[in-house]
A protein has these predicted regions:
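Cysteine-centric segments in proteins
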Residues: 17-146
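Sec-dependent signal peptide recognition
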Residues: 1-7
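C-terminal motif of bacterial Sec signal peptides marking the signal peptidase cleavage site
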Residues: 12-13
């Protein structure tokens, strides 16, 4: 009985939380505050079928204080880091009620799949396309806790 209780306590202590808040200056590599989500991502094959899931980190990078919203430093971003060290940054848009969402239209497409996953179709400045899915919940979390 004591062993199983100890094992359960140790497992609970080692379980990683989905969201981590980091205040400004709390890390060596990022000066502003940010929110990190431990999520799953999977690449999508040319036939539209997803590959195996792999861990990924999703960051919400808020605007820097006193930065103009017309500049990159004055906007909200989501940065997705894949397990192979690739990363993408996606600017977010805010509506009149200050609810954040992914942009739609243009060369990029971001669509909820209705099964807890979101499909991202992105193109970088060079025209290289990237298609992947993620089970990120960061926008729901941010909009619920604003």
């Amino acid at each position: 009985m004591k062993r199983s209780l100890l094992a359960a306590v140790l497992l609970a202590a080692c379980t990683q939380t989905r969201f981590e808040h980091h205040p400004s200056g709390s890390t060596d590599w990022m000066t502003g505050s940010f929110l990190r989500e431990h999520a799953q991502c999977r690449t999508v094959r040319p036939d539209g079928q997803p590959d195996a899931e792999a861990p990924c980190l999703i960051y919400h990078l808020p605007p820097m204080p006193d930065a103009s919203p017309k500049t990159a430093l004055g906007r909200h971003f989501v940065q997705i880091e894949f397990s192979d060290r690739r990363r993408v940054q996606i600017p977010l848009i805010a509506d009149r009620r200050h609810q954040l969402s992914f942009p739609t239209g243009g060369d990029s497409g971001i669509q909820p799949q209705g099964n807890g996953w979101t499909r991202f179709r992105l193109a970088d400045e060079g025209g290289t396309r990237s298609v992947f899915d993620s089970d990120t919940q960061i926008l729901d979390y941010l909009n619920r806790n604003r």
